[in-house]
Amino acid sequence: MRSVLTISAGLLFGLALSSVAHANDHKILGVIAMPRNETNDLALKIPVCRIVKRIQLTADHGDIELSGASVYFKTARSASQSLNVPSSIKEGQTTGWININSDNDNKRCVSKITFSGHTVNSSDMARLKVIGDD
């Protein structure tokens, strides 16, 4: 009887964990090394067709200045969308959610996200971590 209760409790706990994990569909899409000089062609390519509704940006290992970002969709016409990104992100700071692909009727796959910007206040290259939510 005790083993049945232990198994039942274990199954319930496992189901609770899996529902929490499913509710939080945040995935690291990739990391970009930010050069010290202003660069406008930093691309994060998404190899698998992925519908992403919004992204967050985190500055790892240095401060970052951004002058722009765009998202490109896998469509016949290579559609793109400019993103409203903050001009600076301090080391360890994470931005709020930046909405993309807001047209729910036309779910488009993201093929790449490009950034313009550079590392500031560091002799090493900062890293820009891109987190996606689908």
Swiss-Prot record:
It comes from the Bacteria. InterPro entries: UPF0412_YaaI (IPR020240). Transmembrane segments: none annotated. It holds the Pfam family DUF2541. Residues 1-23 form the signal peptide. Keywords: Signal. Belongs to the UPF0412 family. HAMAP family: UPF0412. This is UPF0412 protein YaaI.
